[in-house]
Amino acid sequence: IRESGTSRGSFYHYFEGKDALLSSLSYLFDRKYEELSPTLSPEEDRFQQLMYLNRELFAMIENSISPDLLARLYSSQLVTRGEKHLLDHNRTYYKLLRRIAAEGQARGELRRDVTVSELVRVYALCERALIYDWCLSGGGYSLPQYSQTLLPMFLGSFRGGQRSS
């Protein structure tokens, strides 16, 4: 409250508590995905679309969200008894990932022997793991750069037989 420069009354008018403020970060991420979605080329390989979305979101995170604040979000999601916003499959994030995964399977760019739900679950798990490590490291390295190295290695086995650059 002190860092935001607002009164306690104003803060609690907009947020029920600190957890509500922290969970609003997931909505910030969704707004970024809504901004990026129209920029996806229909011709681009869906695996590459996922890498693009990751790079852009992680660049936004690195440039505008402190590792400490992000760590608090993750911490609150671990202990909350209520809604876990990061896992809400009705979020824009999950809807967009499901669409891309389904299109990738239909185009032969992503494996068809793995369900769309499993592809999305593993992708989201990898992103959370990278963010968690970045927070543990106090933001000591470039999140988007490191992710662009590791994410293709983590997810490469999900690529289909058709490869395009």
Please report, for each region that a protein language model flagged, where it lies by residue.
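Secondary-structure edge/capping motif, primarily at the C-terminal ends of alpha-helices
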Residues: 40, 68-77, 130, 134-138
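Short secondary-structure transition hinges
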Residues: 58-98, 109, 118
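C-terminal peripheral helix-coil segments that are non-catalytic and often amphipathic
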Residues: 52, 56-59, 94-95, 99-107, ...
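Hydrophobic recognition helices of helix-based DNA-binding modules
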Residues: 25, 29, 33, 37, ...
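Hydrophobic alpha-helical connector segments
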Residues: 24, 28, 38-65, 116-123, ...
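All-alpha amphipathic helical-bundle segments outside canonical DNA-binding/catalytic cores
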Residues: 48, 85-90, 106-122, 141-145, ...
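Helix-turn-helix
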Residues: 1-20, 24
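Amphipathic, non-transmembrane alpha-helical scaffold segments
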Residues: 22, 26, 30, 83-94, ...
